[in-house]
């Protein structure tokens, strides 16, 4: 494991614990021996108020490679979400998470999670990852929002 990646992730964890957006979760997983695994984080993103996503808390796994922060983490909703920019596997399709697009080593975990929250309600139809959600979003917005609200209810923390 890269010392650079671990040191950066330890800094990220410290910064997150000191200050993070309300309702969001980002916690490194534990190894079988009880030690912290900074390369694998369990996160949760709340649906934004005033949107069909409101009320939901959407669980996401963030996996870091040894060359982080040179390469972005892989962000994957578990279970996968109904959304035009979420692959059927749950992986998020977002330009800041792609090395050959808008990824920059200075981007923080907080910025990634806020960016994904923004993407939930504002899909990028230029870069679809899920055919069904994309088609319904483009052809029947009322049905799309109905499904999103049902999903938010299903993933409500209460």
UniProtKB/Swiss-Prot annotation:
Pathway: Protein modification; protein sumoylation. Residues 13-18 are annotated as: Interaction with SUMO1. The record marks 100-101 as: Substrate binding. Keywords: ATP-binding, Cell cycle, Cell division, Chromosome partition, Developmental protein, Mitosis, Nucleotide-binding, Nucleus, Transferase, Ubl conjugation pathway. This is SUMO-conjugating enzyme UBC9-A. The record marks 4, 25, 57 as: Interaction with RANBP2. The active site is at 93 (glycyl thioester intermediate). The gene is ube2ia. It is found in: Nucleus. Accepts the ubiquitin-like proteins sumo1, sumo2 and sumo3 from the uble1a-uble1b E1 complex and catalyzes their covalent attachment to other proteins with the help of an E3 ligase such as ranbp2 or cbx4. Essential for nuclear architecture and chromosome segregation. Mediates nuclear localization of vsx1. Required for progression through mitosis during organogenesis. The lineage of its organism: Eukaryota, Metazoa, Chordata, Craniata, Vertebrata. One of its GO terms (cellular component) is nucleus. Residues 4-157 form the UBC core domain. Belongs to the ubiquitin-conjugating enzyme family.
